[in-house]
Every structure is written in C-alpha cells, then in structure tokens.
C-alpha cells in the first residue's frame, strides 16, 4: 500500500505528470511510465499515480492490475527522487502479466525516465 502522501489524486496533478513541462516518458508492451520533476515541488515527497483503462479488462481485472502495480511501486519508492511525480499507465497486456514481470518493467522504465537527460546523451 502506498502512503497517502505518496499518491497523486487530482486530475491536474495527473495532467502535469503526463504532459507538463519537463515530463519524460518511456514505454513497453506492458506499461508506460511518465515522470515529471517540477521545481515547485522540490523537496516534497515523490508521488505516484496509476492509469488503468477499460481496455485492460473488466473492473476485477483492472483492480488486480492496480494492486500489483501499487505493491511493486511501494517497494521502489526510495528510488524516486523527492519532488518527482510518476504516472504508470497499464497497457492491455498487463492483465496477463505476473507481478515479477511488472516489477522488472517498472525497474527498467524508472531507470530510463529518472536518468537525467544530460547524462543520457553523454
């Protein structure tokens, strides 16, 4: 379970993380990870949100996918820098994925979106 202070809640927060200035995205067949570090949030807790659409499946399947993603990310909160908002969007294939696969994808994609862009180019 994610602590309350680490959750994205408002649609404005989701929009800023998905499309805001400085947002970064990396994706795979299972999930897409968006991250945004806003100067206004410097020093605050990292926040995480999940987007699991009806394309993933019915309500039971969507909730199962969200539970698995939440559990995987709760164990990785320490890797997310302070002031960073992360949104994880599940693709339909995520409904058949096991937790270990989701965890590996989260690790790989978090590394890609959280690596500073200047270091990535060098």
Where are these regions (language model features)?
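Positively charged, solvent-exposed patches that mediate nucleic-acid binding
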Residues: 1-122
């Amino acid at each position: 379970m994610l602590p309350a202070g680490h959750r994205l809640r408002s649609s404005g927060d989701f929009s800023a993380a998905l499309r805001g200035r400085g947002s970064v995205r990396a994706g795979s067949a299972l999930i897409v990870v968006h991250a945004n570090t806003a100067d206004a949030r410097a020093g605050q807790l990292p926040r995480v949100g999940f987007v699991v659409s009806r394309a993933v499946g019915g309500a039971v399947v969507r909730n199962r996918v969200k539970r698995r993603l939440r559990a995987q990310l709760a164990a990785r909160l320490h890797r997310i820098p302070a002031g960073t908002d992360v949104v994880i969007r599940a693709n339909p294939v995520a409904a058949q994925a096991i937790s270990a696969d989701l965890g590996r994808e989260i690790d790989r994609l978090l590394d890609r979106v959280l690596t500073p862009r200047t270091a990535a180019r060098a």
